[in-house]
Amino acid sequence: MLIDTHCHLDAAEFDVDRDHIALMAKQQGIDRIVIPSVERANFDTVIALCNRHQNCAYALGIHPMYVDAAVSQDIETLQNYIENFNPIAIGEIGLDYFLRTPKLNPEHIEKQVMFFTEQLKIAAHYDLPVLLHVRQAVDDVLKYLRRHPVRGGIAHAFNGSLQQAEKFIALGFKLGFGGAMTYSRALKIRDLAVKLPLDAIVLETDAPDMAPAWIGPGVRNSPLELLKIAQVLADLRQLNVTQVHAVTGCNALHALPKLA
């Protein structure tokens, strides 16, 4: 089973061919596509999209890069949506310390942390896994996961150290690998993709972002690229790609049981 565990198919970049892409993905052997929300404003959008396409499944959450526009009422709204719409996970949630601008000040970080921890509490209450955004914030994400334990999930677009990866695995998480792994210069990620146990890895595209090497930066990524991404992982690990499909698919179902 081949599963794209992280794809923003609702993004504006897909307005011209969204439904066609979802259909083509199914026809090309991509069994499931996980579509996380990023803010309250697109909860309904991802739900409607996944209702149109049975191979798509949605997660609901508030992304750390969208907390500036978020209000505390959004947390209550998220709870109401969980009770009424049964998402497969809470996500995309987490912390993002990448923005080296005045915006990344203590008050902004505090708001990120507040939304992250409140959503972890919701995930624990409803026994849902989480889809984590951890950009340049791996240690802090781990810290709050220890304070607010959840049933696991996926650390999306993982780019930490082997030791940090092992800490996520110990907490019940799988690690997402996608387009970044396809670049020959991405030595750390490629090394991780080989050294980690295969049963800790899931595949993703993060489309329309994180375009693989054969597309190049700045060009729209697509869930249709998952087949080649899987082949890259197979080549790095010197495995048959069929085995990569089977094991990473099983890993995704373990991390996100409602996908089954």
Whereabouts are the PLM-identified features?
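Mid-domain alpha/beta scaffold segments of enzyme catalytic cores
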Residues: M1-A260
